[in-house]
């Protein structure tokens, strides 16, 4: 197959767009902030098809299962994996902040902090209890779930729909074939929309730099650097070890999904790359049923980057305000973070709301301390989203391997750049 000119490769276009966005935001901030609709529009185009794609993928995957017990088995293994790896992420964030101490030296008096800027986040977090979260999974109507784009609600509907089709067998084949055909159409739409990724990345990055400015990063560079370094260590060491045990290289896997990562980098939303990630994982040898169950669930239950961020941000605020936390308080923080992190999603800003929910149950630390990181949260959200998407990709491969539904030949071909897996134009490799 003839190799594309480098300027036609999607990830090259996205890199160029991000660089141009940074330059425009730095030198022409007023004009750059007007570029926000470009980023918002791209994310809306992607979110437009996320719900239907999840529904169709899960339904066809479950409908094709001969053993319905497999649905519960796959879900159980995925949740077990999520909890174990999420705990590692929380502990790593805690340990890194203790070792590098990014908040030491600020010496801020909590009484001087104005909490008005974070009041809206605190209000949203206050209403998020575990019971509310579980009840929220049940939609008011099927139509409402799709209209609001609620991933877990759509997943619940798809599980029920697919289970009934599997029970019907041949009698439901017409519906299954229709949904399978619809899946192909939806991924075709994604391929078209993905071509607009450079425009979306340019708009989102230009707005971010134009609104907040590079200068806003300087006082808190140590925290940003600590977070990025910790996330890299998590991907290379924790996820890298898991990948090696499973039989693949984390470096090659990251390279394989580089286009999706660059889209996430430009938009700060891991949801922006969800459809492409699901397709890439199928092409890498993961079964459709496992992809359909693990990836959407992971977007609420397996947010490794958000977990690192939460424990690190809480300890940073404590260090900056000279508040000492006992080990018992830190263990309580871990336990609470395990619950509150499940309410976060792949959308920009959700991590900050989750942080507010976590701080609310640690009364020693003032909620107003969140203003210290409000200005840089937007710059940290990119790293959160990047870590989240890599974590969900690795989780899907691992669960597929556990289920013995991983085509290792396809995986090897995908990660080494050989074979048929790169024939799809959207793959860009």
UniProtKB/Swiss-Prot annotation:
Belongs to the dicarboxylate/amino acid:cation symporter (DAACS) (TC 2.A.23) family. One of its GO terms (molecular function) is malate:proton symporter activity. Keywords: Cell inner membrane, Cell membrane, Membrane, Symport, Transmembrane, Transmembrane helix, Transport. It is found in: Cell inner membrane. The gene is dctA. Coiled coil: none annotated. GO terms for biological process: L-aspartate transmembrane transport. It is a multi-pass membrane protein. Gene3D superfamilies: Sodium:dicarboxylate symporter. Pfam families: SDF. InterPro entries: C4_dicarb_transport, Na-dicarboxylate_symporter, Na-dicarboxylate_symporter_CS, Na:dicarbo_symporter_sf. Responsible for the transport of dicarboxylates such as succinate, fumarate, and malate from the periplasm across the membrane. Its main location: membrane. This is C4-dicarboxylate transport protein. One of its GO terms (cellular component) is plasma membrane. The chain crosses the membrane at residues 9-29, 45-65, 79-99, 149-169, 185-205, 223-243, 308-328, 356-376.
């Amino acid at each position: 197959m003839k190799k594309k000119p480098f300027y036609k490769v999607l990830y090259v276009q996205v890199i160029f767009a991000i660089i141009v966005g940074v330059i425009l935001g730095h030198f022409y901030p007023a004009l750059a902030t007007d570029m926000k609709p470009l980023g918002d529009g791209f994310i809306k185009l992607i979110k437009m098809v996320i719900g239907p794609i999840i529904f169709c993928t899960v339904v066809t995957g479950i409908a094709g299962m001969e053993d319905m017990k497999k649905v519960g088995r796959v879900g159980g293994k995925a949740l077990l994996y999520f909890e174990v790896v999420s705990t590692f992420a929380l502990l790593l964030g805690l340990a890194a902040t203790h070792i590098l101490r990014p908040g030491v030296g600020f010496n801020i008096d909590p009484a001087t902090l104005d909490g008005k800027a974070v009041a809206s986040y605190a209000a949203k977090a206050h209403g998020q209890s575990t019971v509310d979260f579980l009840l929220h999974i049940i939609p008011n109507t099927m139509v409402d779930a799709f209209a609001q784009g609620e991933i877990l609600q759509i997943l619940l509907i798809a599980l029920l729909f697919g289970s009934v089709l599997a029970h019907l067998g041949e009698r439901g084949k017409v519906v299954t074939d229709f949904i399978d055909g619809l899946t192909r159409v939806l991924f075709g739409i994604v391929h078209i929309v993905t071509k607009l990724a450079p425009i979306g990345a340019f708009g989102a990055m230009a707005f971010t730099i134009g609104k907040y400015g590079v200068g806003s990063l300087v006082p808190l560079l140590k925290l940003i650097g600590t977070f990025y370094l910790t996330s890299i260590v998590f991907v290379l060491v924790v996820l890298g070890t898991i990948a090696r045990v499973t039989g693949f290289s984390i470096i090659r896997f990251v390279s394989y999904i580089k286009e999706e990562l660059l889209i996430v980098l430009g938009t700060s939303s891991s949801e922006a790359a969800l459809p492409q990630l699901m397709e890439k994982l199928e092409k890498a040898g993961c079964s459709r049923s496992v992809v359909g169950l693990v990836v959407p669930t992971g977007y609420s239950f397996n947010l490794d980057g958000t977990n690192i961020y939460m424990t690190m941000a809480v300890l940073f605020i404590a260090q900056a305000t000279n508040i000492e936390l006992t080990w018992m308080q830190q263990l309580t923080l871990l336990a609470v973070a395990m619950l509150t992190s499940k309410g976060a999603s792949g959308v920009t800003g959700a991590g900050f709301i989750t942080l507010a929910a976590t701080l609310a149950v640690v009364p020693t630390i003032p909620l107003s301390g969140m203003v210290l990181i409000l200005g840089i949260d937007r710059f940290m959200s990119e790293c959160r989203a990047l870590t989240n998407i890599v974590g969900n990709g690795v989780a899907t491969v691992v669960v597929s391997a556990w289920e013995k539904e991983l085509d290792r030949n396809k995986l090897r071909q995908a990660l080494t750049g050989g074979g048929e897996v790169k024939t799809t134009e959207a793959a860009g490799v």
